[in-house]
Amino acid sequence: MLFSMVRLAAGFAAVAFCAQAAAAAELKVLTTPALSEVWHDLAPKFEATGHKLILVYAPSGAITKRVTEGEIHDVLFSTTSGIETLTKNGKVIAGTGTLIASSGMGVAVLKGAPKPDISTPEAFKKALLAAKSVAYTDPAAGGASGAHMAKVLERLGITKEINAKAKLGRGVPTASFVVKGEADIAIQQLPELLGVQGVEVVGPLPGDLQNVTPFAGGVHVSSANPDAGRALLKFLRSPEAIAAIKARGLEPPPAAKAS
C-alpha cells in the first residue's frame, strides 16, 4: 500500500513537472537600452517562473525599422510611439501595448569632478561650451535621446560648436566616454547614466529643454509564445517590478504606482 502511494505521488509530481515544462517558454525580447538596468534586476525574477528571456538591445528607432522589415521577437519594448506605430502596422498584437515607465534625460560627469551649473537653459549652454568634449547618443542611431539632444543644440544655437567636439554614442552608454576620459559631460536617458559606474549624475536637463520619454511593451503578432509574452508584461506592472523601475531612475505609470 505504501509503495502504491509512493508511486502515485511520484506520478503526480511527474505530471506537474511536465505541465510546468510545457508552460515554460523561451522569450526573445527586443528592447530599448533605457530599460537595461531594469532588466538586470527583473529578468532573473521573471525567469524564476520557469520562462527564459533572451534580451537583445537596440535604439527605439532601430526597433521600429527592424521589426517593420520583418524581424521577429516575441516581445518588444520601445517608446510608446514606436509600439503604437508597430501596432498600427500589424506587427504588435492589438491590445497588448502596455505602458511600462517614463524617463527623463540627464547630465553626468566623472565621479568626484566639479559639477557644472545646469540649473537653467542658459547655464546648461555655458556648461556645454566650456566642456572639452560632450558625449551624447548619435541622432542617426535612432534613439530618442540622441534625436532630442540634436534639437536642444539647435535651439541653443550651438550645434556647430558642440558637434565639433562631440563623442557620439552608438550602442554604448554615453557615460562610458566620461569614464575613459574622452568627454567631460555625458547626456542620455537618466537610467542609462545611472547604470554606469564611475560617474555622477548632475541632474536632469533644465526647464523646457527636458524631454520625458514613455516606454511601452507589446507582443509580436508572430510570437511563438504570446501567453508568456503577456505574462511578462503583466509582471512588469507588479509591485515588485514597480519598485525596481523606480530604483533605476524611471517613473512607473500613474495607474501602476504602489499606494
Predicted regions and their residues:
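Short, flexible active-site-proximal loops enriched in glycine and acidic residues
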Residues: 13
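Exported/periplasmic ABC-transporter solute-binding proteins
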Residues: 25-72, 77-81, 85-90, 98-103, ...
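Bacterial N-terminal signal peptides that target proteins for export
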Residues: 1-10, 19-21
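Basic, amphipathic juxtamembrane/active-site segments
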Residues: 94
